[in-house]
Amino acid sequence: MPKYDSHLKCSFCGKSQEQVRKLIAGPGVYICDECVELCNDILDEELLDVPPASTGERDGTGQKQKKSGQPRRRLTLEELPKPTAIKQYLDEYVIGQDEAKKVLSVAVYNHYKRLNLLERNQEIDPGDAVELQKSNILLVGPTGSGKTLLAQTLAKILEVPFAVADATTLTEAGYVGEDVENILLRLLQVADLDVEEAQRGIIYIDEIDKIARKSENPSITRDVSGEGVQQALLKMLEGTVANVPPQGGRKHPYQDCIQIDTSNILFICGGAFVGLEKVIEQRFGKKSMGFVRPGEGPSKEKRTADVLRQAEPDDLVKFGLIPEFIGRIPVMACLNPLDEDALIAILTQPRNAIVKQYQTLLGMDHVELDFQPDAVRAIATEAHRRKTGARALRGIVEELMLDVMYELPSREDLTHCLITREMVEKRSTAELLLHPSSLPKPESA
């Protein structure tokens, strides 16, 4: 027989340890299993009565969410943003990549028209109406070329829900990782749990090349994060009614699922596809032959981009994507690698350019910040050497500005900062703090 302490009682109902199955101790208090169960019932009832959270703020992708209880505004055919207007907006934030911008602009415009036609067909006899099928998109480009930024910029102007997902976290059902239905869950959350709105949305799946199978031939072993994920995505890309767990499927296996029809959801996939150019060159039987002087001809990155534009479905199959998956993404656009001139433009021209961001930061401390043209080019040269595209720019500028950003809030005698090429090469702006009364001047050649 277990021994009970008759002095121990539940602090809520007053029952002794002998009268309950379990008594849980806390700092000076106790609670029995019956009270715990009662609290769970109360919380469940409260959660059922609470409407979805409404913030009216922008979500993680930068898209403004609709307020709870208010339907998202539907654009008429005359109000639809034209492809040229969409591209002009993308030009304000993303440098270059005109081909990819045109592909995305046309795809988004056609997506709007498909939704508009569906609404009109519901008002007439649907049997006589023409159905417009969606054309999912594949973006191919090196790291840091702007694939994700294009998607995030699109999210700012769209009147339909837009979600961004990462393919590297996905695994086949039953294994550690995320189910493919979690992609739809992100879109559902952006739509404020409005199923009808989510079914009109757009999903961008990043790093899609990371789910390529390890070899061209089908494997006899289980590839849970490669071919298995591609198989799971097939019906979702084409159009199916998917069961989406609103709290995530792995931790809450017994919850009620929400059904979402993906037939009208536009999918945009992006990836670097490192090594695809070698597969294409093997198809053409091309080898690097002859002698080329350094500096002559296009750069290696430019040659790679030119080769990728000749990619065919068979090349993607050899890379590791299954034919069924490729067939559901009929449109492909290639992004150009960024050269030094493009990196300079990224530093200075976009609305959210890095130089403008730091000028705003220092301006809040009443300090004027200027970059000499040679300094900007030196930053771009170093970023190009690191071969990580535009992502390298912020790291270089952060390292460069560390000393000034650290000392500046405590210095009232510093009112002007001029960044020179020498400072960029030294990766330090410490000398600015030594002589704040005079502007540093570049050494004469």
Curated annotation (Swiss-Prot):
Residues 1-51 form the ClpX-type ZB domain. It comes from the Bacteria. Component of the ClpX-ClpP complex. Forms a hexameric ring that, in the presence of ATP, binds to fourteen ClpP subunits assembled into a disk-like structure with a central cavity, resembling the structure of eukaryotic proteasomes. SUPFAM superfamilies: Glucocorticoid receptor-like (DNA-binding domain), P-loop containing nucleoside triphosphate hydrolases. Belongs to the ClpX chaperone family. One of its GO terms (cellular component) is HslUV protease complex. CDD domains: RecA-like_ClpX (cd19497). Residues 50-77 are annotated as: Disordered. This is ATP-dependent Clp protease ATP-binding subunit ClpX. ATP-dependent specificity component of the Clp protease. It directs the protease to specific substrates. Can perform chaperone functions in the absence of ClpP. Transmembrane segments: none annotated. Keywords: ATP-binding, Chaperone, Metal-binding, Nucleotide-binding, Zinc.
